[in-house]
Amino acid sequence: MTAANQNYGTGRRKSSSARVFIKPGNGNITIDQRSLDVYFGRETSRMVVRQPLELVELLDKLDLYITVKGGGISGQAGAIRHGITRALMEYDETLRPALRAAGFVTRDARRVERKKVGLHKARRRPQYSKR
């Protein structure tokens, strides 16, 4: 890929990190050398990835090349959505208010809470016996 007519955005969600390159095309979405439908088996994950493009009505006008690392399916889909949003803002700054209103610009900062000593999980306490 040439850097001449492409835009780039990095997206993160939970422990996933996605690098998104967009360039004018006909709507091909390639994730780690696989198509969107092959990479994500769940329709909900595919919908999450397409959301920013559908919002700004550029779904069939841009080609996306994406690499993603870490995390699970949901985290990767969220990271890709965040990366696409950032790349779209670099592509056309006038799209920012619409993307911001939809909540795609803000990085979802929620992380897995750590397990504490003396507890079974992060908050699950051992069963209490009164007698």
Swiss-Prot record:
Q: Which UniProt keywords apply?
A: Ribonucleoprotein, Ribosomal protein
**Disulfide connectivity?**
none
Q: Supply one GO CC term from the record.
A: cytosolic small ribosomal subunit
Cite the InterPro entries for this sequence. Ribosomal_Su5_D2-typ_SF, Ribosomal_uS9, Ribosomal_uS9_bac/plastid, Ribosomal_uS9_CS, Ribsml_uS5_D2-typ_fold_subgr
Q: Which Pfam family is an annotated match for this chain, by its short name?
A: Ribosomal_S9
- Report if keyword Transport is assigned: no
Q: Which GO terms describe its molecular function?
A: RNA binding; structural constituent of ribosome
| Protein's UniProt keywords contain Nucleotide-binding | no
Q: From its record, what is one biological process in GO terms?
A: translation
* Organism domain of life: Bacteria
Q: Give the matching NCBIfam families.
A: PRK00132.1
Q: Which PANTHER family match?
A: RIBOSOMAL PROTEIN S9 (PTHR21569), SMALL RIBOSOMAL SUBUNIT PROTEIN US9M (PTHR21569:SF1)
Query: Which family does the similarity line name?
Result: Belongs to the universal ribosomal protein uS9 family.
UniProt-recorded name of the protein: Small ribosomal subunit protein uS9
Q: Whose protein is this, by species?
A: Actinobacillus pleuropneumoniae serotype 5b (strain L20)
Q: Which gene encodes it?
A: rpsI
